[in-house]
């Protein structure tokens, strides 16, 4: 019964996506891997978000390690955010999932491995350069900057990839709200998926 329910949900989601203009490509076992960047592929970076209190003008600098927990707190308080510093990649060492990314490239090929970040799209050049410095080469178009830190934004992006025919999807992110949002969406699809929270040892 559970399998039938999932299939019905899957068809309903597909029908809804088709109405919204997505086109589906039928392919057998098409795998992909999606990695967050900060605190996942890279740690100890020197970038920061500037959070401004619209009432008082008070500014707080939030680094990428603090962002997953501090960001939602400040957003709830009405703070406004400036991500300009995240166009660059400053500092940083190998993150906990960098080797996993290399493994997934060997398994699925570089064209099926993606970086999905809340940084702006303008950061793609710097991210690409940093990855290349680590011996990682994926197509430049596979680096997506959403300029949006909401988990739903990443979930919607994953749905787009599902509509392109991917049916074996791996996603990893350090921010629990992102992990939950993506897992909630992928669990409704009749596909193989694995959603992981990146943790620094």
Label each PLM-derived region with a short phrase.
Residues 129-137, 158-164, 183-192:
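Short, surface-exposed basic-aromatic patches at helix termini and helix-loop junctions that form
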Residues 28-33, 154-177, 182:
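Conserved Lys-Pro-Asp/Glu-containing loop-to-beta segment of HAD-superfamily phosphomonoesterases
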């Amino acid at each position: 019964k559970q399998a039938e329910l999932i299939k019905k949900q899957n068809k309903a989601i597909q029908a809804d996506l088709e109405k919204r203009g997505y086109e589906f490509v039928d392919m057998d076992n098409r795998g992909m891997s999606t990695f967050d960047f900060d605190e996942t592929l890279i740690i100890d970076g020197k970038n920061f978000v500037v959070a401004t209190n619209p009432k008082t003008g008070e500014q707080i600098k939030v680094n990428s390690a603090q962002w997953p927990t501090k960001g939602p707190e400040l957003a709830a308080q009405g703070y406004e955010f400036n991500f300009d510093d995240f166009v660059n990649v400053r500092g940083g060492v190998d993150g906990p999932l960098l080797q996993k990314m290399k493994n997934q490239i060997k398994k699925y090929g570089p064209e099926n491995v993606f970086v999905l970040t809340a940084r702006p799209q303008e950061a793609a050049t710097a991210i690409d350069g940093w990855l290349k410095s680590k011996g990682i080469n994926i197509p430049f178009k596979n680096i997506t900057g959403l300029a949006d830190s909401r988990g739903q934004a990443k979930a919607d992006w994953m749905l787009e990839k599902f509509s392109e025919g991917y049916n074996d999807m791996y996603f990893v992110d350090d921010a629990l709200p992102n992990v939950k949002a993506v897992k909630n969406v992928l669990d409704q699809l009749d596909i193989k998926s694995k959603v992981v929270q990146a943790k620094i040892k």
